[in-house]
Amino acid sequence: MSRLFLLGALLAASLQGTASASCPDFLNHSMRQLASTDTIQFCEAYEGKALLIVNTASYCGYTRQFEGLEQVHREYADQGLVVLGFSSDDFFQEDNDEGDAAEVCFEKYEVTFPVLATSPVRGSNANPVFKGLGDAAGYPRWNFNKYVVSSTGDIVGHFSSGAEPDSEELRAAIEAALPAASS
């Protein structure tokens, strides 16, 4: 009986190690969602998914890009893409009240993709996701920088604020990152 238990424990440990090994370090974190107590553990929630990660703000000239990001989210969700917004006040254009920031995202722009609670996205104080992205591909120089991460965890591209969600270059990177394309 104890041998069977030991075998089961070893099998469970090896499977757990495999799951965490396939998750890049920069995504192996949990963060709280905007204006919520709910958290997302990125590796568990988005294993095998491509990600479009964007640093967002409510009062920026690029805030209108929420519309295009929502369109990308709706267009590619069934193909394995998740758009993730990371609210940030690093450029002093995010509302200090999370409820008001959430109102901009979810009511004004009718965003349905996840947006995370306000956190730093650049420098030594960057949240762990943006620390990994920034170290590997460069930190955001403004709001609405976009990072495309493949379903295997590779950073496919980093796009500046000026790259519109419907740009050919961004769309090409997204399509290359989708699960069928990157496996």
State what each model feature region is:
Residues 15-30:
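N-proximal helix/coil linker or "cap" segments that precede and/or mark the start of modular domains
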Residues 55-59:
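Amphipathic alpha-helical repeat scaffolds
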Residues 29-50, 71-76:
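A short beta-strand-turn-helix
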Residues 62-126:
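Structural microenvironment flanking redox-active thiols in thiol-disulfide oxidoreductases
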Residues 28-30, 117, 150, 178:
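Terminal helix/beta-alpha structural elements that buttress the NAD(P)+-binding lobe
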Residues 4-13:
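Sec-dependent N-terminal signal peptides
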Residues 47-51, 77-82, 109-114, 143-144, ...:
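Loop/turn elements at helix/coil->beta-strand transitions in domains of secreted/extracellular proteins
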Residues 128-131, 135-183:
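Thiol-/selenol-based redox modules, centered on thioredoxin-like
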